[in-house]
Amino acid sequence: MSDGIKLYVMPTGTMHADLTWLLLRPDMVMADRHNTARPANWAAVPTHCVYIDHPDGKIIWDAGVPRDWEERWGPTGLQEYFPVDEVTEDMWLDSRLKQLGHEPNDIDYLLLSHLHFDHAGQAELWKDATHTKVLCSKDEYDGAFSYEGYSLGAHVKKDYESLTLETVEGDTEVLPGVTLLQTPGHTWGTMSLKVDLPDSGTMIFTSDAIYLAESYGPPAIGAGIVYDSVKWFASVEKIRGIAEETNATVVFGHSGAQLAELKKIPDYYS
């Protein structure tokens, strides 16, 4: 743990989507024989990034959705299933940086949980950065560059191909009290972020290792977008074990209900 850390949660716009993508819970998303015409559960899917002002460096966790989402996602069809239809000018990550008084190159570390379209969407802000270290997991890097063409599933190469990416393997402490956790399953190399704060205690930002409180359980409930279900369930239990050991606050990847209750920029956790 390190004294003097400030952690800011930054909403970066809300998509809407069929909840089935995020939660395979029959009573919430599926028809049954008594209700065969049940409509889709069209749900809010908020996104967020995190800024950590640490005595030893400035950190951004994830890069949100891109401003040009409709055009960028056009070749993939993702814009039809995940429209970014609830966002204001101040929410885009480049706007958030200005609110913090920073340019992209002022940031010491950009930590990318994984390289999906809604987590690396504005990572291009760092394509010309000479100071910032941009980190993802080795498994995510290998997978994200393993295919030919514009996209594969929710990976869109335009988001990350211009970046100078450095990779990590295993759980890695980036700065004192700030640790990347390997939590694969959602993608090849999804990571979560553990931050040990002097006053607020430990916080674990799960990204898409755990979408929602309902995903976490127990028991854990899977989702429509999962690359490896066995690894995904193992990652949920890894997070649960760490959370129980450290009495951590677990912050889910896309929970609107939880996000509404969290402190948000300009307020912070310390």
Regions found by a protein language model. Name each.
Residues Y81-S95, D199-S270:
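Cap/insert and terminal regions of metallo-dependent hydrolase folds
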